[in-house]
């Protein structure tokens, strides 16, 4: 007899659907498709990695074979919980559990693989200690773009090869495909092969991140020896039915967070546990924008003596403040002295260190930091009472 969702408000998604979701996640995630898979039975797993190999010796007749030691390290894969919440109509409670998750399978998988790629490749909203690109930067294996992508990628491959590794795959932004299609070798043959099941560049597989997770400001393409990129998965996807929550990060058509009780809805929370670790940063290299290292953050932002909410942090771009004064002095300082700062109160330009005049109600202050071709905008909504 089929189980109905109303009778199973929490537990594991049925195995036949869970396994299909995991397959969909693997198909949609570039980092999973390229990395070495590690099955995890617990939340932590030690992975033996050889740092120097054992040696072999020529042995004469009657001679004893020498022994040599190999050096090992044991980095840990640590599984972290990844969750997605999908609001649905309350009528879904009357459907079978299998039918509900069959219908939501694609949405759940897409949310998972986009978040996985963003976290593992670039460290975006990541619970992991480091990311693939973070490791590449630490190793100094970055090639600033020159406008000749074939040469730039060759130079990145050389970085890896100089360290004793071999590039056996790439991952890149989907926007690079058009450029790669135009590349030819000396004989006029295409350097990029767009096959039905496998795409290749420099005769190595290339995976394009098409799920919105790629950060073009950080890198254009990453290549490496992918057995040193480890992805761990703890089997099983859990679910929980939410009935009373307000979904702060899910907005209705009116722009307000969805209140499940008020709107006669439920939400399905699905969670899985995954782990990521790059064990040898020198095995990877990236082609980066020419000005990738240009800093476009602020080191300080003050509006008189007003308290910004949240407290100022260079990586936070949205703030609010309240004032009873007619004017307040705005001061904004770029972290990089070579960057320019443009301040506007509405459409009125304000020089840093000068006063802004407030209208009653909300006033929008924007602070734009520009460094080379990169820019970042901070916004403060100042309410004058």
Segments from the language model and where they lie:
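Extended oligomerization regions of viral-like shell subunits
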Residues: 41, 137-266, 270-272, 293
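Short, Φ-rich (hydrophobic/aromatic) sequence segments
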Residues: 16-27, 100-104, 108-116, 156, ...
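Alpha-helical scaffold segments that mediate packing/assembly in large oligomeric complexes
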Residues: 73-76, 84-162
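Beta-rich interaction/scaffold domains
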Residues: 293-385
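Short helix/loop capping segments that flank catalytic or ligand/cofactor-binding pockets
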Residues: 55-58, 96-97, 179-182, 277-279
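Glycine-centered loop/turn motifs
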Residues: 61-64, 203, 217, 353-355, ...
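Long, low-complexity, intrinsically disordered extramembrane tails
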Residues: 287-293
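Assembly/oligomerization interface modules of large self-assembling protein complexes
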Residues: 2-84, 283-284
